[in-house]
Amino acid sequence: MAEPARALRVVRIYLDGAHGLGKTTTGRALAAASTAGEGVLFFPEPMAYWRTMFGTDALSGILAASARCAAASHGSARARRAGAPRRRGRGGPGCVLPGQVRGPVLNFARARVRAAAPPGPAPGGTVTLVFDRHPVAACLCYPFARYCLREINAEDLLMLAAAMPPEAPGANLVVCTLPPAEQQRRLAARARPGDRADAGFLVAVRNAYALLVNTCAFLRAGGDGATAGTRWSGRTQMHWPRSQTPVVMNAKCAGAGLRDTLFAALKCRELYPGGGTGLPAVHAWALDALAGRLAALEVFVLDVSAAPDACAAAVLDMRPAMQAACADGAAGATLATLARQFALEMAGEATAGPRGL
């Protein structure tokens, strides 16, 4: 009888944050840091998918629709409706990919009634999967920024947030940050066509990620999305402002209060039909689903002001504190093939698998 493959420890890291910070550069530096037995697989942002796979440049269409909304007196209803399908489409690759990765990781775990990996080294070694963005970017943070600018309504935002796929055990989100002036400088230097760099939008995106970090801290500390929903009576509206005031990020990811979260920011009249005081059940269910997805994330914050190699080293230094999952040792080759295929089709580039897999 063939000897079973030794258990492989799988650490999944999603690099996320506002655009123009240097996430992709940090991800590539992480991939270059692969060593024997400690491979790093990089899943880049799917630029080729958005720009070439459908015969039209979908990314340019999304950005153009966004610009039209911004120019049309904070977004007319017609412009918002026209842009919604494109916004949902942008999340496609990121929403599908977790399911492909989940297969080889969780099939082994289910067979042993164990999903999370125990602490310490695994017999089959460790593989780190690094993703350039989590679905939370397309499904929540960027739509939320546009909601704050009154370019989309709360209904669209809730619909997009509810579409975020559930996470398998072992997901770690590293939210990248930069001082605003340095972000502007890097955006100008990369000069990507269609990049939206107006100050109001950048503040809104940074606020979205700050609230995301605070929300995850609130949930991990025992905060309950359902409780948050029931506390939203019409008489206790929090009136979180759709303003340009920067939100303070709970950088240590410690406990945060309800008022510092996305739940407070979504306390709005639009979700209460007819001016009622009770939150409709369907909205409460959507918010509870969102809370469940966010609670599964272990969140870290990283200032990426340093050189890419230093940022990559900082991420690797976070790994002992990160959650992990188990896979059969044979899954390493499957994951390496998946990473190569994704990089080739979604980013238009070939990438070699890491050493040690």
From Swiss-Prot:
The active site is at 45 (proton acceptor). GO terms for molecular function: ATP binding; thymidine kinase activity. Pfam families: Herpes_TK. Substrate binds at residue 192. GO terms for biological process: DNA biosynthetic process; TMP biosynthetic process. Keywords: ATP-binding, DNA synthesis, Early protein, Kinase, Nucleotide-binding, Transferase. The keyword Kinase applies. Gene3D superfamilies: P-loop containing nucleotide triphosphate hydrolases. It catalyses: thymidine + ATP = dTMP + ADP + H(+). ATP binds at residues 17-24, 186. Its EC number is 2.7.1.21. Belongs to the herpesviridae thymidine kinase family. Homodimer. Catalyzes the transfer of the gamma-phospho group of ATP to thymidine to generate dTMP in the salvage pathway of pyrimidine synthesis. The dTMP serves as a substrate for DNA polymerase during viral DNA replication. Allows the virus to be reactivated and to grow in non-proliferative cells lacking a high concentration of phosphorylated nucleic acid precursors. This is Thymidine kinase. The lineage of its organism: Viruses, Duplodnaviria, Heunggongvirae, Peploviricota, Herviviricetes.
